[in-house]
A protein has these predicted regions:
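Extended, small-residue-rich solenoid/repeat segments and analogous flexible loops
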Residues: 5-64
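Short, conserved structural micro-motifs that define repeat-unit consensus positions
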Residues: 51-55, 88-91, 145
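Beta-rich strand-turn-strand
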Residues: 134-149, 154-158
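Short, Lys/Arg-enriched, disordered terminal segments
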Residues: 1-6, 179, 184-188
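Flexible, glycine/small-residue-enriched loop-and-beta-strand segment within the central core
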Residues: 34-41, 61-70, 74-142, 169-170, ...
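Catalytic-loop signature of eukaryotic-like protein kinases
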Residues: 72, 147, 164
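Acidic, glycine-centered active-site loop in nucleotide-sugar glycosyltransferases
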Residues: 162, 167-170
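Short conserved catalytic/interaction loops centered on acidic-Pro-aromatic/His motifs
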Residues: 104, 145, 161-163
Length: 188
């Protein structure tokens, strides 16, 4: 009941607060005001299942109450995070990201697709220290490995290995962030 109350309060009032990091010129200096950051963090941390410390929820960020997000992570403007999503520590999520954890059934051809219902939700996991760019679409069952970067506008339909850079539609890995020799010493 308590989480529901704070979730409703966040939805009703959180978007009215200023941006998380607002700089106002004052006698030749930029004054940093972050009341929106603290207000949304206060409400969201009480509305979701697991909220790490120093998490940032930008204006118009929406999420389910079952969200689990790690320390020092941030959700960008106009991003929607449904249920069954886990976000690790130190993750940067850009604006307008869309997560899909479920989808329509389309297996049968004898009845219309709109009457076939939904497939079971498949969880999405974003491991620690990831950067997800603007307008990325992440499809059901995907895991984005630790330290990975997903470029703006990518459609992620398959899991991304750790320390990778993925871009495009569909997203494909274009490079590794670390050398293979560093990977082998990391695992020992």
């Amino acid at each position: 009941m308590r989480r529901r109350f704070f979730s409703i309060l966040y939805r009703l009032t959180g978007h009215w607060m200023p941006d998380s990091y607002l700089y106002i010129p004052f006698f030749g200096r930029n004054i940093h005001i972050s009341i929106g950051l603290y207000y949304r963090r206060f409400l969201a941390s009480r509305a979701i299942k697991n909220c790490g410390k120093n998490v940032n929820f930008e204006r118009h960020a929406r999420f389910s109450r079952s969200l689990s997000i790690g320390d020092y992570s941030g959700i960008g403007k106009d991003t929607y995070v449904p249920s069954d999503v886990t976000i690790g520590k130190y993750c940067m999520l850009g604006p307008e990201i869309v997560f899909y954890t479920d989808n329509h059934n389309t297996d049968r051809t004898d009845i219309p697709m709109c009457q076939q219902g939904f497939k079971s939700p498949r969880p999405i996991v974003i491991e620690d220290d990831c950067w997800i760019g603007r307008r990325v679409i992440i499809l059901p069952g995907v895991t984005i490995g630790r330290g990975s970067i997903v470029g703006a506008g990518a459609v992620v339909s398959k899991s991304i290995p750790p320390y990778s850079v993925a871009v495009g539609n569909p997203a494909r890995v274009v490079k590794s962030r670390i050398s293979t020799s560093a990977l082998s010493t990391d695992s020992n």
